[in-house]
Amino acid sequence: MMKLTCVLIIAVLFLTACQLTTAETRDEYRAVRSSDEVQNSRSTDDCSTAGCKNVPCCEGLVCTGPSQGPVCQPLA
C-alpha cells in the first residue's frame, strides 16, 4: 500500500512539472505565468478591435459608424 501511495505522489508531481514547463507557451495556463506577463496580456484589453462605443479602438484602427453602434475599422 505504501509503494502505491509513493508511486501516485511521484506521478502527480511529474505531471504537475510537465504542465508548468509547457505553461509558458500556452494561454490556457495563465495562472502559472509571472505577474508581468499577465499584466502585458491585459494591456491589450484596453482597446477594441470590434465596437468602439465604450472602449477606444486599438492602434491602427479608427472608430466609424453611427453613434448607436460605431465599429473599429482599419485606417484607409
UniProtKB/Swiss-Prot annotation:
Signal peptide, first to last residue: 1-23
Residues making up the propeptide: 24-42
Tissue spec: Expressed by the venom duct.
Entries under InterPro entries matching the protein: Conotoxin
Domain of life: Eukaryota
Pfam families per the UniProt record, alphabetical: Conotoxin
Major site of localization recorded for this protein: secreted
Cellular compartment(s): Secreted
GO cellular component: a single term: extracellular region
Protein name: Conotoxin VnMKLT2-013
Residue runs in coiled coils: none
Free-text note regarding domains: The presence of a 'disulfide through disulfide knot' structurally defines this protein as a knottin. The cysteine framework is VI/VII (C-C-CC-C-C).
Keywords: Disulfide bond, Knottin, Neurotoxin, Secreted, Signal, Toxin
Protein's organism: Conus ventricosus (Mediterranean cone)
GO molecular function: ion channel inhibitor activity; toxin activity
Annotated spans, Disordered: 29-49
Lineage, top ranks: Eukaryota, Metazoa, Spiralia, Lophotrochozoa, Mollusca
Cysteines paired by S-S bonds: 47-58, 52-63, 57-72
Sequence similarity: Belongs to the conotoxin O1 superfamily.
